[in-house]
């Protein structure tokens, strides 16, 4: 249930206005102009004053019994539904749901242009227009913060860092040796620009390699909570536009991640590897160092990648192999275990 402590309901909204707002509706249904929607709820909890959505077929059975006044469904949905529920067919029902959330809700907590008294901002730092700098934020010399940005409490922005317009840096984020584009969202506890894990070993002693690279992050990138991104030792660590990086991800020094790629929680990418454009790495995936993962590659959860992968391949397992080979290996292993157990019983 949505809590009014944190989010403000902007409704009610007329159903006709909702359909007009969503734009990508296929053959908009004819609805009475007086139908009013008060809230968004899941199918199981929706009442006759609510709108719901269906994007995962696993929940389609609830469409038969839901009390929702309307439901956004995929354009090719052919299942059964409550005859009293208006079906709104969308090109992408989950995307439409995301737009609907923005239409109905806004966070209670808001920020206005202000630098809190407890913040420490160097005289040589440049803070753009309409920025909010929270309690106990530290901004060092020669930092540039773009217009309309928010730096929340306890964050540290190191010397010379450049952050673009409309950035949101949540609490207790640390950023050093970094250049960050516009529209960045960096969630609480992320660490960006620290030295990578690089050593030279001489006579049994591991000597630290001084890192002289930086982290370059493109436009419209999201970095999850407690994710760590090391700066390069010689070549820069680069994250291109439109990337989405989940919580608790480790990105090693000199890694390059291509435009639009998605990295799910607890994944780790070792130094100097390249991830192509629009790749997807599942949870707990590990990528060894100095590899080239080409555009459009998908790696299933817990996959361990030890060699280069060609474009648009789907792999899984550890060591990672083509996904169908991995499934076959799993089936064969299961059969071998059954056979072995039956022999032991005899």
From Swiss-Prot:
Q: In which pathway does it act?
A: Bacterial outer membrane biogenesis; LPS lipid A biosynthesis
Q: Name one Pfam family in it.
A: Hexapep
Q: Where along the chain is the active site annotated?
A: 253 (proton acceptor)
Q: Which UniProt keywords apply?
A: Acyltransferase, Lipid A biosynthesis, Lipid biosynthesis, Lipid metabolism, Repeat, Transferase
GO process annotations (BP): lipid A biosynthetic process
Signal peptide annotation: none
Enzyme category, top tier: transferase
Q: Known EC number(s)?
A: 2.3.1.191
GO molecular function ontology, one term from the record? N-acyltransferase activity
Q: Which reaction does it catalyse?
A: a UDP-3-O-[(3R)-3-hydroxyacyl]-alpha-D-glucosamine + a (3R)-hydroxyacyl-[ACP] = a UDP-2-N,3-O-bis[(3R)-3-hydroxyacyl]-alpha-D-glucosamine + holo-[ACP] + H(+)
Cellular component (GO) terms are: membrane
Q: Which cysteines are joined by disulfide bonds?
A: none
Family the entry assigns: Belongs to the transferase hexapeptide repeat family. LpxD subfamily.
* Function of the molecule: Catalyzes the N-acylation of UDP-3-O-acylglucosamine using 3-hydroxyacyl-ACP as the acyl donor. Is involved in the biosynthesis of lipid A, a phosphorylated glycolipid that anchors the lipopolysaccharide to the outer membrane of the cell.
Quaternary structure note: Homotrimer.
Q: What name is this protein filed under?
A: UDP-3-O-acylglucosamine N-acyltransferase
Cite the source lineage.
Bacteria, Pseudomonadati, Pseudomonadota, Alphaproteobacteria, Rickettsiales
